[in-house]
């Protein structure tokens, strides 16, 4: 009996094992078959897999190399190397569907957007019931553990277009249970295009929609911005990366209901024409946030700093660099912003910033330090007959203890002005009303010659000497201005007229003679009052001063005498000016050269050293213009290089770079819409090698001309050093002449005579020179 019972048990186990085994063996391929047979019927999409393993006794499912295709397409919508899940069968008895574990191995999903439609819209429509069932189901659902390893998410937008993805996506969550409101987990991923990583943890209450998260971002590439920028800009490039360490709590249903703290930094920011030319850049923009809550109207920062910012604004003949990029008055941006059928990340960021900025000033705010360090703000004007360039560098701005509850907040700005000068501004402002502030500013040591591009274009007269200072005090209450502004131009000297077509002519020497006060100084105070909307410039005070200056010179003050003496001493250093592109010595300079020659002949042991100081940028610009105009002239006259003579050279030299026919010639030859300036067009036409050759030839010709003015007997006492390329304070290339020891009186006197210092009223000198 025992043997029979034992035998029955063994046979039963064998049968059970065979039944289970056969069930598993047959149900797995059957599952694969049924899925692939009815996939399109129930999902509208083709689903494939290498193999399936299903255990109906344990509730374990495993699909290998699962692939779900796009609707009526061979392209993949979703794939996963392995999909595994465990269903608790016993819980089904209690009307509970519980997935104890769900694992996705290297899943790849693709989201495609076309206007307002997505590539998963059909799935939502297929599985969404026609009528919402409001009856309470008796079934409960839980998923206890979710794990995603090595995933990828791709996002494609067809209109702009956008192509972006993240990789190495890892998510691990304790899941959600039917009787627990919260879901928690951790996540991490890498940038698919570029560098950088993101990791963090989250906790969401599914009932109240409250959330909290900790987020750490390291050097995450923001190049997706460049793809959205292409819809806004006619051209351009963008790159930057993000660092962040943020802790936040909030509510999903209200975007304003968020409170966060931590650090946010945008690094290595570059935006510009191309990869080599930036319009805006910075090394780091960093915010240290102590407490930020739009809903509570609270903005507290430990610091906000912008480090090494760079900004370049350029004016062209009919537009500027920003309008050339974004359309006239930002037309491209407005068009995209007004199109509600499109999503543009840049527009949405701008809208969010605008809302937060409005909320910021309506809230309590405190910033312990707001700073800009080592900035470089550049302005180029190519709309003139020659390029004007200036910049604030290094630009520094600091404001400490900015607090809305304080009566006054102070800030200071200090900057160098290049090519010459410096600026300082101090401001005391009411944080509750920006229409209340006091300001003092001072701009000093600015070279008058640096404005020669404007003077030549609008008067035809450059200056080769002079210094500008501007300072003032503003007291503003409730938007009403009371200010005194003081303009001082020290010892300006007008040089020879530049005769060019398309250049206005104004008798600048005569005007200077009217407006200069005693001591060769222009000194005026210009009060400004009124409001910001309707400021009043008290020009009548200047006019009365001008009229008085014509008939009665002000008394000679100690200050102006000191200024004159300082300027007089400055000019006692020996220099020999070279007007732009000139190689011959002027008759007025010949006397000075003869004095040097006589001194060297009388003192054989003496020697002088010449240090050429070349204004390379300006000389090369003039050479470039000449060579480009020469090409145009020769094409127009059908001439060759051999037949180009001095008369032709004079005609080319007198031709304006603003000549309409010349500009049409450049446009027709080059056919490049990305060349915005006359300098760029001429450079592409001529080539840099020809300009460099012309500049070297110019330097050699000047050296030969200078040496040929001396007798052979003294040439051994003259040494000409290698040149130095600079931006000269007085606006022209020059030779610096050094003599070992104190400068001999005879040379100093000859030099002073060369300068023709004007001790008499300059107006009288100008009038005497007229017929």
Walk through the language-model features, giving the residues of each:
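Buried hydrophobic packing residues in well-ordered domains
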Residues: 39, 63, 83, 102, ...
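Terminal hydrophobic membrane-targeting helix
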Residues: 19-115, 132, 137, 143, ...
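Transmembrane beta-strands of outer-membrane beta-barrel proteins
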Residues: 214-216, 261-265, 305, 440-442, ...
């Amino acid at each position: 009996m025992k043997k029979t019972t034992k035998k029955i048990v063994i046979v039963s186990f064998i049968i059970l094992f065979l039944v289970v085994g056969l069930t598993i063996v047959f149900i797995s391929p059957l599952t694969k078959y049924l899925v692939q047979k009815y996939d399109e019927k129930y999902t509208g999409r083709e689903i494939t897999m290498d193999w399936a393993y299903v255990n109906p006794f344990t509730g374990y499912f495993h699909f290998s190399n699962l692939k779900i295709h796009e609707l009526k397409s061979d392209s993949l919508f979703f794939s996963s190397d392995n999909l595994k899940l465990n269903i608790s069968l016993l819980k089904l008895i209690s009307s509970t569907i519980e997935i104890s574990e769900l694992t996705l191995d290297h899943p790849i999903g693709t989201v495609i957007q076309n206007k307002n439609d997505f590539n998963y819209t059909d799935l939502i429509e297929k599985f969404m019931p026609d009528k919402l069932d409001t009856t309470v189901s008796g079934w409960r659902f839980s998923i206890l553990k979710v794990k995603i390893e090595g995933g990828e998410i791709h996002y494609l937008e067809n209109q702009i277009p956008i192509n972006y993805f993240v990789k190495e996506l890892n998510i691990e969550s304790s899941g959600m249970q039917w009787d627990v409101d919260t879901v928690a987990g951790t996540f991490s991923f890498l940038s698919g295009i570029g560098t950088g990583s993101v990791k963090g943890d989250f906790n969401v209450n599914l009932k109240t929609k409250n959330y909290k998260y900790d987020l750490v971002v390291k050097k995450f590439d923001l190049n997706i911005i460049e793809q959205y920028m292409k819809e806004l800009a006619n051209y351009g490039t963008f790159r930057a990366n993000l660092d962040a360490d943020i802790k936040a709590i909030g509510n999903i249903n209200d975007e304003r209901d968020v409170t966060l703290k931590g650090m946010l930094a945008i690094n290595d920011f570059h935006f510009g024409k191309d990869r080599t030319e930036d319009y805006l850049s910075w090394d780091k923009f960093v915010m240290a946030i102590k407490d930020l809550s739009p809903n509570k109207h609270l903005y507290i920062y430990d610091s906000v700093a912008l480090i090494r910012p760079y900004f370049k604004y350029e004016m062209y003949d009919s537009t500027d660099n920003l309008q050339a990029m974004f359309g006239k008055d930002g037309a491209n941006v407005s068009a995209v912003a007004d199109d509600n059928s499109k999503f543009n990340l840049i527009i949405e960021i701008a809208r969010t910033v605008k809302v937060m900025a409005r909320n910021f000033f309506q809230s309590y705010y405190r910033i312990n330090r707001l700073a800009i360090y080592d900035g470089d703000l550049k302005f180029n004007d190519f709309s003139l007959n020659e390029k004007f360039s200036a910049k604030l560098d290094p630009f520094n701005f600091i404001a400490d203890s900015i607090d809305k509850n304080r009566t006054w907040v102070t800030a200071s700005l200090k900057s160098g002005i290049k090519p010459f000068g410096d600026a300082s501004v101090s401001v005391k402002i009411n944080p509750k009303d920006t229409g209340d502030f006091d300001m003092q500013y001072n701009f000093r040591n600015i070279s008058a010659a640096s404005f020669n591009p404007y003077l030549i274009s609008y008067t035809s007269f450059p200056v080769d000497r002079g210094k500008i200072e501007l300072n003032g005090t503003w007291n503003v209450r409730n938007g009403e201005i009371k200010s005194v502004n003081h303009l001082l131009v020290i010892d300006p000297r007008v040089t020879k007229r530049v005769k060019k077509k398309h250049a206005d002519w104004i008798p600048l020497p005569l005007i200077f003679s009217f407006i200069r006060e005693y001591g060769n100084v222009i000194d005026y105070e210009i009060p400004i009052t009124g409001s910001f909307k309707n400021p009043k410039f008290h020009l009548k005070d200047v006019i009365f001063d001008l009229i008085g200056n014509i008939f009665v010179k002000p008394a000679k003050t100690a200050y102006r005498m000191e200024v004159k003496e300082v300027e007089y001493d400055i000019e006692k250093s020996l220099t020999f000016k070279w007007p732009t592109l000139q190689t011959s010595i002027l008759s007025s300079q010949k006397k000075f050269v003869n004095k040097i020659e006589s001194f060297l002949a009388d003192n054989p042991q003496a020697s002088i050293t010449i240090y050429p100081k070349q204004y390379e940028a300006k000389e090369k610009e003039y050479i470039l213009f000449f060579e480009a105009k020469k090409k145009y002239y020769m094409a127009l006259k059908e001439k060759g290089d051999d037949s180009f003579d001095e008369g032709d050279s004079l005609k080319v030299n007198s031709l304006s770079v603003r000549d309409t026919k010349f500009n049409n010639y450049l446009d027709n030859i080059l056919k490049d819409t990305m060349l915005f300036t006359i300098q760029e067009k001429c450079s592409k036409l001529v080539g840099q090698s020809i300009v460099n050759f012309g500049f070297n030839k110019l330097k050699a010709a000047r050296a030969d001309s200078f040496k040929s003015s001396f007798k052979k007997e003294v040439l051994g006492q003259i040494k000409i050093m290698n040149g130095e390329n600079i931006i000269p304070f007085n606006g022209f290339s020059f030779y610096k002449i050094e003599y070992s020891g104190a400068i001999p009186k005879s040379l100093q006197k000859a030099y002073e005579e060369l300068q023709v210092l004007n001790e008499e009223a300059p107006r009288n000198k100008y009038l005497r020179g007229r017929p």
